[in-house]
């Protein structure tokens, strides 16, 4: 993660612009926190230790080497909220329906608090090393392996977000077109086939945007994306009081079960319960954007950035819970992994408007995430100098692969499940705790904190060991039963 999980602050836009030279210095991304004229770091690289450690020296640096933050606390909260908000919000009602209200609330609260703790670990690591970029931090602590692991986790997370956004186009655009044509949902034709439409949108709109050399104003669409999701939440709450339970589906055969079907469940276990935790984790990933936002924060300090994360996560917690609970109380066990798809827009201008707004938002957000993934690949291959043929070829190949995955993936819960138990788990649990334990392994004063970090790491490993086999088992059962999972 709608990411809209992209956290589009200035630092990211600079990083996503393709550099002109092969040997590009990344020192502009290495900020150093200074307290009383000295760097507070016990894990500083040899290269940096040879530099003068005084404020006067820092003031003499070039602007691209040390840039004081200029973003206010309020705008930083907005930026981090943008980074947190993603397509995961559409799957939370489905997660609630398969866990029950009480269990879902426990899971949502737990992931929120654990995510805040992981950001605290990340900020401590940044302060100790002087690194303000996640990949640089991994490289300094674990060498090339650390850099590759973080690049891989971040790229997988962004790819998962792109898949979920294009899946929304595949699901929602046919309904929107049918509504605009005045046709019923049962209407079928090649031009309202989601698979055809997602390919047309990808190569007609997204491909030209992805071929641009830099993002330009496209990078500022995250504000629009967040606004769309706030609008979606308002509509979900409003529609709860308009749509009757079972949505007119009850008849003489099922009337006896209507009361039970329209009664909220507080604790539920079934084969789909396994997707709840990965979906929630997917919805809260913002860690690649935390350090860039930190670097832009005015008068930055660890305490101030922690306040930014606390406010942002609390706001998203409220928004996520309201969306999940009202979506669930509208459709109960009939809710789908894409909540928006359950609403019928035929003859309903409000639903049609929110559907079109979300479609436009995700279409504009995909290129932003694509720039990040492609830039990461070029940097790993040390091919940072712009080359038109390579630029076009890599773009087309990646978009073809992504489209094939979108066409053949049965439902959004599969995206949430896979990305949630892999990259989201790595970015929230495993990487921050591993970095912290490595950095503080010589610090005897932090034994208590190290124990908590070790438990946090163990929790992430346990999450993977339990969730991955269960997701695979559900796929196997669904396939053997001839069901789409």
From Swiss-Prot:
Glycans are attached at residues 251, 257. The chain crosses the membrane at residues 75-97, 113-133, 149-169, 189-211, 217-237, 274-294, 311-331, 349-369, 392-412, 415-435, 451-471. Residues 98-112, 170-188, 238-273, 332-348, 413-414, 472-485 are extracellular. Inhibited by alpha-(methylamino)isobutyric acid (MeAIB). Inhibited by lithium, potassium, choline ions, N-methylglucamine. The pH dependence has an allosteric effect on the transport. It catalyses: L-glutamine(in) + Na(+)(in) = L-glutamine(out) + Na(+)(out); L-alanine(in) + Na(+)(in) = L-alanine(out) + Na(+)(out); L-asparagine(in) + Na(+)(in) = L-asparagine(out) + Na(+)(out); L-histidine(in) + Na(+)(in) = L-histidine(out) + Na(+)(out). The keyword Acyltransferase does not apply. Pfam families: Aa_trans. The modification Phosphothreonine is found at residues 11, 54. GO terms for molecular function: active monoatomic ion transmembrane transporter activity; alanine:sodium symporter activity; amino acid:sodium symporter activity; glycine:sodium symporter activity; L-amino acid transmembrane transporter activity; L-glutamine transmembrane transporter activity; neutral L-amino acid:sodium symporter activity; proline:sodium symporter activity. It is found in: Cell membrane. GO terms for biological process: amino acid import; amino acid transmembrane transport; female pregnancy; gamma-aminobutyric acid biosynthetic process; glutamine transport; L-alpha-amino acid transmembrane transport; L-glutamine import across plasma membrane; neutral amino acid transport. The keyword Transmembrane applies. It is a multi-pass membrane protein. This is Sodium-coupled neutral amino acid symporter 1. GO terms for cellular component: axon; basolateral plasma membrane; external side of apical plasma membrane; membrane; neuronal cell body; plasma membrane. Induction: Up-regulated by forskolin in astrocytes. Disulfide bonds join 245-262. InterPro entries: AA_transpt_TM (IPR013057). Keywords: Amino-acid transport, Cell membrane, Disulfide bond, Glycoprotein, Ion transport, Membrane, Phosphoprotein, Sodium, Sodium transport, Symport, Transmembrane, Transmembrane helix, Transport. The modification Phosphoserine is found at residues 6, 25, 28, 49, 52, 56. N-glycosylation plays an important role in the L-glutamine transport. It comes from Rattus norvegicus (Rat).
